[in-house]
């Protein structure tokens, strides 16, 4: 398996993120704003407006996601943030809150065409978990599609429909299903264990 290196998206890595997303802003001018903005605002800022908003977030050192590198080139992205930062997710009727516990949400993946099929999704998830843990998170939540659901069973994975990830990748890393949001989509969680420092004897 190809070795990837993953890092939080900081202002120093903005040009790498911009090059990865390209002129299309990852997909249709999204720039990873679909879950961050109210739907009406997203429609207004789609494209260049979303690019500017993402840059402002990165420049403010809010580190809205993880970049994966193959060599010196960014080839993958995973969006992660505290759920309250994701306005559209908070307002979602399908992906509504399971409870009132504080969670960090993994919302999307974008992987360059040449890097697909190399196991990069799991690498990004691991880095996202570490990032959330370093920021004090106790629960990481994800909303992947379930390719084993009767409706999707036997179908070929589609990078667009699976932009929120696939359940099998999350299960491999210890996530558990807490709720079925729809026939094909799950809400999954990973409980992050607190590292307790032992007292010196």
Placement of each model-derived feature along the sequence:
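Conserved N-terminal entry element of GNAT/NAT acetyltransferase domains
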Residues: 1-36, 199-201
């Amino acid at each position: 398996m190809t070795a990837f290196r993953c890092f939080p998206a900081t202002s120093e890595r903005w040009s790498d993120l911009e090059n990865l997303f390209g002129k299309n802003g990852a997909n249709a001018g999204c720039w990873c704003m679909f879950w961050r903005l109210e739907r009406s605002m997203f429609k207004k800022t789609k494209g260049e407006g979303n690019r500017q908003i993402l840059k402002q977030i990165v420049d403010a050192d809010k580190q809205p996601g993880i970049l994966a590198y193959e060599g010196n080139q960014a080839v993958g992205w995973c969006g992660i943030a505290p759920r309250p930062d994701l306005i559209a997710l908070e307002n979602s009727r399908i992906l509504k809150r399971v409870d009132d516990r504080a969670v960090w949400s993994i919302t999307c993946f974008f992987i360059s065409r040449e890097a697909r099929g190399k196991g990069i999704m799991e690498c990004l998830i691991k880095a996202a978990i570490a990032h959330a843990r370093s920021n004090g998170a106790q629960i990481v939540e994800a909303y992947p599609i379930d390719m084993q659901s009767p409706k999707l069973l036997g179908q070929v994975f589609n990078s667009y429909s699976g932009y929120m990830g696939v359940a099998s990748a999350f299960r491999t890393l210890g996530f558990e299903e807490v709720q079925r949001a729809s026939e094909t989509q799950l809400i999954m969680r990973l409980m992050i264990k607190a590292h307790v420092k032992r007292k010196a004897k």
